[in-house]
Amino acid sequence: MSSTTQAPEPVYQWTADEAVQFLKEWNFSLGIILLFITIILQFGYTSRSMFIYVVKMIILWLMWPLTIVLCIFNCVYALNNVYLGFSIVFTIVSIVIWIMYFVNSIRLFIRTGSWWSFNPETNNLMCIDMKGTVYVRPIIEDYHTLTATIIRGHLYMQGVKLGTGFSLSDLPAYVTVAKVSHLCTYKRAFLDKVDGVSGFAVYVKSKVGNYRLPSNKPSGADTALLRI
């Protein structure tokens, strides 16, 4: 009996003319998509528009799973062994970083109880207790001082509007910034009134420890800390 061997299927490769033709057909759509993403990433700040910032977070959140899918696709349809090796490495790195993101986000969520813990941009969450309600917002940098401003009843923390109906007397003695591995406590060091309904307070970092925010707080009390 004679055995027949099947010839390997040829690997299709794009030509330069096909690549140019693809860009000509999809150039306008790709340009609009990239322009939209660029505008969102450039102007997506909590101090400007919370809606645009949330859209920015969604785009950033989708980047890693999209990268993992593309890396796996490259592994399945690798052009040669060199491309296959790099694709496997990139896939492993992407999956490991994606898992680390979820682990850190869950740890931060346990510490704060806020869904902002899954913010892909930063692991710093600023927490301020106003009349028993804890406001949590992400901040990009690890600041040595934090500024709370009240303008005619409107509360701003680091330039981000948190709520209305507050006065300078409602500002707590302490503000916290939660991180994955620890929690920073900021003590109020300065308070100044501009007029009867406006003013600001400066908080200075005073303590760092392994704490979490309590789930229940009495109205008007300063934020307490629970060790974990």
UniProtKB/Swiss-Prot annotation:
Keyword field: Glycoprotein, Host Golgi apparatus, Host membrane, Host-virus interaction, Membrane, Transmembrane, Transmembrane helix, Viral envelope protein, Viral immunoevasion, Viral matrix protein, Virion
Superkingdom to which the source organism belongs: Viruses
Homology family: Belongs to the betacoronaviruses M protein family.
The protein's name in its UniProt record: Membrane protein
PROSITE patterns per record: COV_M
Protein purpose: Component of the viral envelope that plays a central role in virus morphogenesis and assembly via its interactions with other viral proteins.
Location of this chain's protein in the cell: Virion membrane; Host Golgi apparatus membrane
Lineage: Viruses, Riboviria, Orthornavirae, Pisuviricota, Pisoniviricetes
Primary location group: virion
Segments on the Intravirion face: 47-56, 107-228
Residue intervals passing through the bilayer: 26-46, 57-77, 86-106
Subunit structure: Homomultimer. Interacts with envelope E protein in the budding compartment of the host cell, which is located between endoplasmic reticulum and the Golgi complex. Forms a complex with HE and S proteins. Interacts with nucleocapsid N protein. This interaction probably participates in RNA packaging into the virus.
Pfam families per record: CoV_M
Family matches, as InterPro entries: M_CoV, M_HCoV-like
Membrane topology listed for this record: Multi-pass membrane protein
Residue ranges, Virion surface side: 2-25, 78-85
Species for this entry: Murine coronavirus (strain A59) (MHV-A59)
PTM summary: O-linked glycans consist of Gal-GalNAc disaccharides which are modified with up to 2 sialic acid residues (done in recombinantly expressed E1 glycoprotein in SAC(-) cells infected with recombinant vaccinia vector).
Cellular component annotations (GO), alphabetically ordered: host cell Golgi apparatus; host cell Golgi membrane; membrane; viral envelope; virion membrane
